[in-house]
């Protein structure tokens, strides 16, 4: 198995190509631009389609068209660009079209800056666009997972005919780590049972999100909720670290989870029983596991680079318990000492 030092953004394209992605449509925006650059470099070499669109809106609508034709298709952006894509993502969900969308989060709101943040959580985990839809959301915390979860994203998108979001951040996109390349590539073939491929076989298929009859649209919405319930039942993923006897549990995803893990090790060395729960899927969220830990008397600390958006989901899952927060915003990374200060405060120890 080949191993090479690559950046997180490059790992996304490696995963996409091994997953059989045959179309990429995008628009450059820092800190996600390398994903587009690498797609432009490698996709045409192997006969796959690449277009640098004239805008973020154009890119997401090209994704819609290619997905409707049965292609494995993706795009990527960051912050302001993701806001511009929200209408198109709602249309993808409404038409039940599979697509993979990567968000390399940057600091906001507005133009903000190109530093890392995790403040797109609500926008993408809760939907973001109009209507009653959900995205499946995967949260990598390493360059390896930037590749592996991209591959998984295409499988989930096809399985549920739904947009799948890779929710990364500027650090993960720009950092370089050793990447173990996938063992084998996937050859994707369009699903002619629903796709519109321009053939006699698919000429009666219809891809649309419009329902002029109110009752039909309501019925479709109920159907979508049943689909999302199936996602919640079958696709929850998380990683635990030293939670077996933990009295304090850190909940963190993405790059913040790596700092949180170091905090667990340091606190454990001081005799404090701390563990880490890392959600890998943000939707579906590991609510049941958090409920179990809450019933065992754990105190939760949400560690995130936002105002506390994920903390609300932890509160709900834990039965509306108080959840502590360690956070930074504006492009600042959470530091080890920030987490340790909160742990020691809860444990009743000195911060010295």
Swiss-Prot record:
InterPro entries: 2-oxoacid_oxidoreductase (IPR052368), PFOR_II (IPR033412), Pyrv_Fd/Flavodoxin_OxRdtase_N (IPR002880), THDP-binding (IPR029061), Transketo_C/PFOR_II (IPR009014). It catalyses: 3-methyl-2-oxobutanoate + 2 oxidized [2Fe-2S]-[ferredoxin] + CoA = 2-methylpropanoyl-CoA + 2 reduced [2Fe-2S]-[ferredoxin] + CO2 + H(+). Disulfide bonds: none annotated. Its EC number is 1.2.7.7. GO terms for molecular function: 3-methyl-2-oxobutanoate dehydrogenase (ferredoxin) activity. It holds the Pfam family PFOR_II. Optimum temperature is 75 degrees Celsius. GO terms for biological process: organic acid metabolic process; sulfur compound biosynthetic process. The keyword Oxidoreductase applies. Keywords: Oxidoreductase. Optimum pH is 9.7. Heterotrimer of the VorA, VorB and VorC subunits. This is Ketoisovalerate oxidoreductase subunit VorB. It comes from Methanothermobacter marburgensis (strain ATCC BAA-927 / DSM 2133 / JCM 14651 / NBRC 100331 / OCM 82 / Marburg).
